[in-house]
Amino acid sequence: MQKVNDPAVRHTSSGALIRRFLPYLAKYKKTLFIDLFCAAMTTLCDIILPKIMSTITNSAMGVGITLTAGIVLKLAAVYFVLRIIDGAAQYFMSGIGHIMGVHIETDMRRDAFDHLLKLDHTYYNNTKVGTIMGRITNDLFDVTEFAHHCPEEFFIAGIKIIASFLILCQASVPLTLAVFACVPLMGIVSVKLNQRLRARFRQQRIQIGELNATIEDSLLGQGVVKAFAAEDEEREKFAKGNKDFEHIKTLGYYAMAAFNTSTRLFDGLMYLVVILAGGLSLVYGKITAGDLVAYMLYVTTLIATIRRIVEFAEQFQRGMTGIERFAEIMDTPVTIKDAEDAKPLQPGPGGIRFEDVSFEYPDDHNKVLHHVSLDIRAGERLALVGPSGGGKTTLCNLIPRFYEVTGGRILIDGQDIQHVTLKSLREDIGIVQQEVYLFSGSVADNIAYGKPGATREEIVEAARLAGAERFIRALKDGFDTYVGERGVKLSGGQKQRIAIARVFLKNPPILILDEATSALDNESEILVGQSLEKLAHGRTTLTIAHRLTTIKDYDRILVLGAEGIEESGTHDELLARKGVYYRLWNQLPGEDTL
């Protein structure tokens, strides 16, 4: 299924992509200049050999200078020196030139990752992680070869073609014009076939992204797959994606075969012209045997150059595709960013105010929140309840600006959040979610995420406050225990308490609890609930409640529904009204009600 940010929807011209790439190349212009100088040296060596052979052949046949052993030795010495120069130049081109390409690839990947960090939730909701991974890893691998070889190959080709043309014209202008008459036609055919080749490579990149996403889903969801005995369904999904990739790659090789075949046909045509026209010129005395030998060698050099460009075409198109997919990331607009007049959020107790706030998701024009006005006192514990889709999570996500309001404004301690920096805003907000995400690393690393550079003493104290120290010390390596990918080695309750410790370490004045205990067993819920009580003390706390029994003692409860805030009050006040909250409470007291 086509995604919103699928690269198939874009087709950027080669010129535009080259212009996009040039600033990265310009950063290493000194290295590039030396690389091109070395390329010129290797080209000079290749061009001189036919001239040496022409001199020897003509001398042997009595044309020009008399051939002697001394002349042969001098020519051999010249060629030997040139080959030493060629070897040194090739070493630099192969080593330093490739390293330059690696540096450029690294710079581009850094910029792509930095831009991805700035993109909002909407982008990630509409783009598969496997596709994104492919773009910042595989797609940029080919840029290394492209960055090194593209300037080098075209520079060498330009020198050889121009030099060959001038030298061949000295031998025979009519013969040279006949040979070069094939070049424009070859260029036209090559451009057409190259366009088809690039389209195939673009399709391959798209499909490998889809395949990566399928594999990621299956592997990360192994618990669900095994629970439902759905291995056959997963094999079928993978087989389809794998087969689609095979088909697209096959089409790519057909396009490459057509490209290579057309080139070989033109090679043969150019040799045929030389054999016919050159042979007749020799018969009628228009050219010497030595010049014809040199002519054949220069034509061979010319054809070898063209073949090298043809062979580079695949690498060129892969590199262009990588740059194109890189550009697609970089051109994705950053919709949530600091305003020009943004200032750091001034420290305060954490009072929050919603003024006539409305919101709708960018890809859905149905309003989730309608003209919501709400005052949350500093230090107040506020619970949000109501049916799914009522806007509870959305309302909370607007406070740290995970999404932008489409109407009205939100203030924290009297400061409009649209005019404060995102970093300072989010540093003042701690979030504990139902689905805890732990990074691959140690327990200590994950707790320290709340305060980069925290000391071990601070980490341990945060764990103690979260009620996590005892179970952490019981682990094999204590705070240095590896938690596994996404924390798979820990239970749900243990992960929640580490997440709470992370927020304790962050120590923000505002706290958002998004159904933080709803997925836990009773024992874990009690332990985590106690940790959350400690965490919420003295902080402005918004809790999205899944179980009504956990919010009975809150300062205020809001019931959100299709019409916005339908009810507001304490637990006892709302029960006394016998409205929406009363009905929810009496559905299944003490159990999941929403």
What is each PLM-predicted segment?
Residues F37, C45, L49, T68, ...:
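Hydrophobic alpha-helical transmembrane segments of ABC transporter permease domains
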Residues Q2-H11, V102, R110-L140, A213-K237, ...:
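Short intracellular "coupling" helices and adjacent cytoplasmic loop segments at the cytosolic face
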Residues G62-G64, T68-A77, I167-A181, L251-E324, ...:
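Helix-loop-helix
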Residues L32-F92, C169-P174, G285-A289:
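Transmembrane helix-loop-helix hairpins at lipid-water interfaces of multipass membrane proteins
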Residues S14-K29, I132:
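A short amphipathic helical element positioned immediately N-terminal to and/or at the very start
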Residues K29-K30, H121-T122, N138-A147, P151, ...:
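An intracellular "coupling" helix at the cytosolic face of ABC transporter transmembrane type-1 domains
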Residues A339, L345-L594:
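ABC-type nucleotide-binding domain
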Residues F37-C38, L82-G101, E152-I159, A178-Q204, ...:
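Alpha-helical transmembrane segments of multi-pass membrane proteins
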